[in-house]
Amino acid sequence: MSSTGPLVCTSIAQVREQIESRVARGARSVGLLPTMGALHHGHVQLARRARDENDLAVVSVFVNPLQFGPGEDFESYPRQLEQDLALLAEVGVDLVFAPDVQEMYPDGVPVVSVTSGAAGGVLEGATRPGHFDGALTVVNKLFTIMAPGPGTPFRAYFGEKDAQQLLLMQRMVRDFDHRVEIRPVPIVRSERGLALSSRNQYLSEEQAEHALVLHSTLRALTAGELTLEQARQRVDAEPEVSLDYLETVDPRTLEFVAPEPGALALVAAWVGPTRLIDNMRI
């Protein structure tokens, strides 16, 4: 990495050339962190893992329109590439792939895309139809673009906060036989427990205070202090918070199960106009 920060590639051809060149010059492994930018400390932890565990660390920054449904925040989603680059420079990331929509989808919406199936139609997928299809499609494309070739380990890093997305990415890799290893990274939280998210910056101070109910309720539920229904009522009773779902699932399949050891509790709620998610193992 240069002393001025990561090299920014805006075209597929350029980032491919850089990866191929650096592998040829001795990089023995490649780590990829796919993001939509608006990076926070949670992303920094993911990027640091990619940096520490690989010779070449690559971060993609692309606000993917396929992941946003009608009425969602695609146009207003924060875009702050210079700030993102400053954070990634501190970590020591080597390459940043920051294409525009035309570069990734030159013909508009792709004719061929990845579908998430039944596991992508529940929980987040029920509220945000098509979201996971869009996420899988772009990451599938990123894997194809970035893969260094046989013989060079290729690892991709995903946060456990997006538990459903993580499971679907793991399934896609298995189903498509991608030469990439998915490495999960634990949730990063604020000092008071709020899961870090790019959308947290939408919250007022008062809303951020109310949002803490998500973490505190998950802790009470996983400790056996609340039933599932009591946990739902507790979240919904919080001012400015509107519950979307609070469920416990088998983390391997996303099938709904009772709140029992080994299950995963997932919550999604609107805090004011901002939608937040969180999860915790029982």
Language-model features: where?
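A structural signal for short secondary-structure junctions
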Residues: 239, 258-261
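Active-site lining segments that contact anionic ligands and/or coordinate catalytic metals
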Residues: 243, 262-264
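Nucleotidyltransferase catalytic core that binds NTPs
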Residues: 2-240, 249, 253, 273, ...
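Short, basic/aromatic-enriched C-terminal tail that caps enzymatic domains
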Residues: 255-257, 264-282
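Substrate/ligand-engaging "lid" and interaction regions
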Residues: 246
